[in-house]
Each structure stands twice: as C-alpha cells, then as structure tokens.
C-alpha cells in the first residue's frame, strides 16, 4: 500500500506491505510519532496516550488504506510555542472536472486523465490500483485468464474464438471492456466501480466480493481515473466517506454530461476527427480505432 505522510518535517509517499502494522509505518518514517490524523471524518490516534497499545494492529484494521493521507505530530514538537491564530483559507474554486465531497470543501473528487491511446481502460485501472502504468501486465493477466477458462470465456461470450481473443487482447490497440474489468477485479481482489457519464450511474463490478474499490470514469469511448484530493484512489465501502464519495461521483458525472464531456454511443453518431468517418455504437468505434490507430473522436450533434 502507498500512504502520503506529512507533518513533523516530513512530506513523502511511503510504500508498505498490504498487511503492514502501525509499528511498520512508524519504523519506516523513523520519527518518534506522538499523534496521527487521517480519514474522513478525521480520526486521531494518540500513540503516547490511550492508543499506545495499537502498535501491532494492521493499518487496514485501523481504517488506513492505500492512498490515505496521514498527518503526524512528533514528540519533538514544542507544544508551548504559541502559533498565530489560523487565517481562514480562501474558498477553492473547483474546476469542471472536480466535485466537492460531502459539501465541506475539504475533500475534492477529481478526474485524473490517462493516455488516450486505445489502452485507456488499462491505464485508468493501473493508476487507480498501483499509481503507475502496468498496462502490459494487466493485458497478460486477462489473456491468461481467458485461456485458462475456455468454458466460462467461450466463443459466444467473446464474440471470437477463445485462443484468438487471448492473443487479440495482448495487442496495445485492442480496447478493453466489461470482460477485462471483471477479470482484473477478481485477480487483484478489488471492486471496480465504473461511473458512466452519459447514463449518470455507477456500474459496480464485484461489489459483493470486495470491500475496497476504485472509481473509473467512462464517457462512452474513453476511461479516466477518479481520485480524492489528487492522491487517494482506493476506497472502502464500509468507511463513512464512501457514500459521500459515490454521491460526488454521480454529481460530477451529471456536470460533465451537461458540458458535453460524454458520448452516447448507442444513439448518436461518433465521428473520427482524423479521417471524418462516422459510427454508431461503441463496437464500431473500437474496431475502427483498432484497425487504424485513430484515437481522436467526437460526437455529431
């Protein structure tokens, strides 16, 4: 897991094992931590007081998941030093690709754009889970799963022979969709919630299997990642913030639809801005992109 730690002279991203404990985190940052704050609503751990016995507790049991921002105070802090009264922060002006979470303005859900190169689904998932590009690894994961389960992923489901599909999805120009989302979600044990801009709804893959989830945004032909405060991408459906995050995601989708950010591939004609050909349906658009390498599309209105 990756955590952003600030305070006590520290401002860094920390990488730990998924089963890391509170002590593992403290040893990694090498600071005599007095207190730490995290989460939404904010939670506080007093390591030199009532919470001193929590050292061997796993971070996820404390509600600290990958992508969390943690603010620490060290024992070396001079508590007697008088700080000037805090000045009110100017109200942040949100961009069209941002939405306040819970209405407080403290947390913001925003679009993290990924490359528009026919691998956008894989880019979006890779950023949401790993914070880095793992497109080739994800494609290989899908290919192996398809080959290993020819009954589940039969020719009728795949719309082509099983072995052909397993080879086809390895090509960087091949578009991914629901099949790939489901396979990757199962393999990485994290639910994937797809925010559909045109339908203004969230399609949840494996929400009954996994508590942790990532959010990816779909405008009809392109996927992007969604992040909280430009860093957190993995959420937990049992955490208090989850409902507010999902509400903000739908509000953001509605706003983006009104600004023409989405494409209705079921009804509207989609135009290739490279060659000016027009298509109806995501499959037609995908086939054209895969055969030509064209990735710049617009909607005829």
From Swiss-Prot:
Segments forming C2H2-type zinc fingers: 270-294
Residues that coordinate or bind substrate: 221
GO terms for MF: cysteine-type deubiquitinase activity; zinc ion binding
Location in chain, cross-link Glycyl lysine isopeptide (Lys-Gly) (interchain with G-Cter in ubiquitin): 160
Catalytic reaction(s) noted: Thiol-dependent hydrolysis of ester, thioester, amide, peptide and isopeptide bonds formed by the C-terminal Gly of ubiquitin (a 76-residue protein attached to proteins as an intracellular targeting signal)
Region (Cys-loop): 114-120
His-loop: annotated span: 218-222
Keyword Amino-acid biosynthesis on entry: no
Keywords: Cytoplasm, Hydrolase, Isopeptide bond, Metal-binding, Nucleus, Protease, Thiol protease, Ubl conjugation, Ubl conjugation pathway, Zinc, Zinc-finger
InterPro entries given in the database record: OTU1_Ubl, OTU_dom, Papain-like_cys_pep_sf, Znf_C2H2_type
Region S2 site: start-end pairs: 243-248
Top-rank lineage group of the source organism: Eukaryota
Region described as UBX-like: spans on this chain: 4-80
Any one GO cellular component localisation term in the record: nucleus
Known role: Hydrolase that can remove conjugated ubiquitin from proteins and may therefore play an important regulatory role at the level of protein turnover by preventing degradation. Participates in the regulation of the ubiquitin conjugation pathway involving CDC48 by hindering multiubiquitination of substrates at the CDC48 chaperone. May be indirectly involved in PIS1 gene expression.
PANTHER family xref list: HIV-INDUCED PROTEIN-7-LIKE PROTEASE, UBIQUITIN THIOESTERASE OTU1
Record note on quaternary structure: Forms a complex composed of CDC48, NPL4, UFD1, DOA1, SHP1 and deubiquitinase OTU1; within the complex interacts with CDC48 and DOA1/UFD3.
Protein name per the record: Ubiquitin thioesterase OTU1
């Amino acid at each position: 897991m990756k955590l952003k730690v600030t305070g006590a002279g520290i401002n860094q991203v920390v990488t730990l094992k998924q089963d890391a404990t509170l002590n593992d985190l403290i040893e990694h940052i090498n600071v005599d931590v007095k207190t730490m704050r995290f989460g939404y609503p904010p939670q506080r751990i007093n390591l030199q007081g009532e919470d001193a016995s929590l050292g061997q507790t796993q971070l996820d049991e404390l509600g600290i998941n990958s992508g969390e921002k943690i603010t620490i105070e060290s024992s070396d802090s001079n508590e007697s030093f008088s700080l000037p009264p805090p000045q009110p922060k100017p109200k942040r002006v949100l961009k069209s690709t941002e939405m306040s979470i819970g209405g407080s303005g403290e947390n913001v859900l925003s679009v993290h754009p990924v490359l528009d190169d026919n691998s956008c689904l894989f880019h979006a998932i890779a950023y949401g889970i790993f914070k880095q590009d793992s497109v080739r690894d994800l494609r290989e994961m899908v290919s192996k799963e398809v080959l290993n389960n020819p009954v589940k992923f039969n020719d009728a489901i795949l719309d082509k022979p099983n072995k052909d599909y397993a080879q086809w999805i390895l090509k960087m120009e091949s578009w991914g969709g629901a099949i790939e989302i489901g396979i990757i979600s199962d393999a990485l044990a994290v639910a994937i919630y797809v925010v559909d801009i045109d339908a203004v709804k969230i399609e949840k893959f494996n929400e009954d299997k996994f508590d942790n989830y990532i959010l990816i945004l779909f405008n009809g032909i392109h996927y992007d990642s969604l992040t909280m405060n430009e860093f957190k991408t993995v959420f937990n459906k049992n955490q208090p913030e989850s409902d507010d995050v999902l509400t903000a995601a739908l509000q953001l989708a509605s706003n983006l639809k009104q600004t023409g950010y989405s494409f209705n591939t079921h009804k509207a004609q989609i135009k290739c801005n490279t060659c000016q050909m027009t298509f109806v349906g995501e499959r037609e658009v995908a086939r054209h992109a895969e055969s030509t390498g064209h990735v710049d599309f617009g909607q005829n209105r």
